[in-house]
């Protein structure tokens, strides 16, 4: 714009020259014009270089650059539960059909307790997503709709990365656009095969998880603690849980190996996402949960009983930090997509101290 304004001013000078002074002025402007004419080229080159650098900096790492593969055939949480019930209908009673609170909506139900018919005290809510929720999941609307935190699936096993994590992660952390959302990453722990050493397999998965996190900028003090998702590792063909091929002691060893490696590499103690029904099914006695109880518990319980009383059934009466209570939450406005929702029950200050998260 500056270039064209000056050019217009200079071009009008020759027609107005009637004196030596004006000719001198024209010569003076003409000299400046040669210098000014180079400005657009310089600006263009600077813009191109800056754009290239910006794009290079903002381009998320793809799976192949990390030596990994994109997840394509993993089951969503809803599909996992369906497969489990198909393989063993008797579990329907234990799960209470995993009835979900389908009417829970952000932000209306965040502020008001429909069970007690009163404003909801001391409760903070969060969301977790994966590529199953779609690339265009409205992350930017979550904080405005009273979601305090967002967990995103990053990886699974030793070979796979969630194809949307590299896009989700920076969007959730875009504080320059006013997004104040405590973001977190979780890894889906794979059982592997009985031939895989449990401790080594756990550590290898941790290294995959850490690799993905670091490649995407690492953790901030305002981020949620890293999480490991330990649940049904369903074979999509048979509907059977692959963990059934593991001994209870191996499962515990793998969890401990994973969490120890992650804590050593990222400097944050992971939380463990787990369902009581799965623990009883795969590991057995609830007393054994004491071996991993040093970690904060992110408990999954979708049962009618838990939702009615807002008191989930924990494992070995362990105090839970976060409770995932539905996979069918929605936003009141802006999107009709369903997603998983969790709650932290307690004062805001306690939320930060309990989970080791820094306030914005």
Residue ranges and their predicted role:
Residues 4-9:
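N-terminal amphipathic/hydrophobic targeting modules at extreme N-termini
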Residues 12-32:
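Short, Lys/Arg-enriched N-terminal segments with co-localized hydrophobic residues
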Residues 32-39:
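Bacterial N-terminal signal peptides that target proteins for export
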Residues 40-49:
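Bacterial N-terminal signal peptides
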Residues 52-56:
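Sec/Tat signal peptide C-region and signal peptidase I cleavage site
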Residues 57-129, 137, 288-360:
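Functionally critical loop-and-helix segments that line ligand-binding/catalytic clefts
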Residues 109-141, 145-257, 264:
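Substrate-binding cleft of extracellular glycoside hydrolase catalytic domains
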Residues 222-311:
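Catalytic domains of cell-wall/extracellular-matrix polysaccharide-remodeling enzymes
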